[in-house]
Amino acid sequence: MVKKNNSNKKTNNKKTNNKKTNNKKTNNKKTNNKKTAIIVIICAIISVFVFAMMLTSNSETSVSSTKTIPTMSDYVDNLSNSHTYFIPQTNSIFDHFLTYNDFTRYHNGNPSPNDGIRITFNESYDTQSILDLKPNDGTVVIYPVFTSAAYKTPGFYDYYAGKCDETCVTDISFENPEFQFTSSGASAQILYLLGYDFLTDIHVDKNPEILEKYDTVILLHNEYVTKKEFDAISNHPNLIFLNPNALYAEIDVNYDDNTMTLIRGHDYPPENPVANGFGYAIEEKFHEYEYELECLDWKFVEIENGFHLNCYPESIIVNNLEILKKMKEL
């Protein structure tokens, strides 16, 4: 009887132990399932977060990429809308148009426009002469948007003249450039009318490699440029400087609000003044010709990577298209 009881006891103990083991396995399995579920949930949350970030990034990139850069055509269209008042000229090549304010000033005896001029070819001008001046393939002109901004008031030149502090060289808007004498307004319009391809400072600064598409790059009075723009232009193998004083001073730009700030050059900064902000030998060599306005002995001088005109032609180019004819032959 004792042996039988012991046997039953062992059997009961074994069943109890097996039940405990099974319960333990079941509990472990439930615990593991919970851990797995938690991990899956965390991974799902992370995945959703990453996906949302990617969508946001793509959205921002899309907005940025679709933000168009104003072109020369845009600027000329604006000029056509603002300069609508015709004034007669003895010049048989171009017709001139002014803004209303300048037109009023003109008839009050002040012929010097504040807002620049718009020019178009006179209908009587020889068509063949225009065709002869059409650009060579692979040529582009860079319109000096930044320089136009620098010469506005209040601006850089108010600072140089001691009329204001460094706020006049800091965060200056470069929107709405003007076709003035100081920004090669007439030269730019003539080249545009002749069919030259145009980029602006902004195009080159944002995408310096764009100049590699062109065989020849023509500079106007691109006095103020960024370091990226300077590097892209100065390293191009075939430049034509239609104006002295190009690539003279370094600026920084902020495309969030379309402003620019003077960094170096034009005897700035005051604690370490320098003339050419880039130490650019070609500009330094031809700098004195900036004030040669009559261009009586004009010529294109060969430089290591192109040619440089030895005068500032803005005053006379509307009457002397021979300069552009010679430029085309270079």
Model-derived features: where do they sit?
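N-terminal Lys/Arg-rich, disordered targeting/topogenic segments
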Residues: 1-33
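N-terminal Sec-pathway targeting helices
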Residues: 29-44, 54
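Transmembrane alpha-helices
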Residues: 45-51, 137-140
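Ser/Thr/Pro/Gly-rich low-complexity linker/stalk segments immediately outside membranes or between
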Residues: 56-73
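Aromatic-Pro/Gly-enriched surface loop or interdomain linker
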Residues: 69-209, 284-288, 292-330
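Intrinsic-disorder/low-complexity accessory segments
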Residues: 75, 94, 141-146, 220-221, ...
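Helical hinge/lid and interdomain linker segments adjacent to catalytic or ligand-binding clefts
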Residues: 177-253
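A glycine-rich, often tryptophan-bearing local segment used as a flexible ligand/cofactor-contacting loop or short
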Residues: 223-306
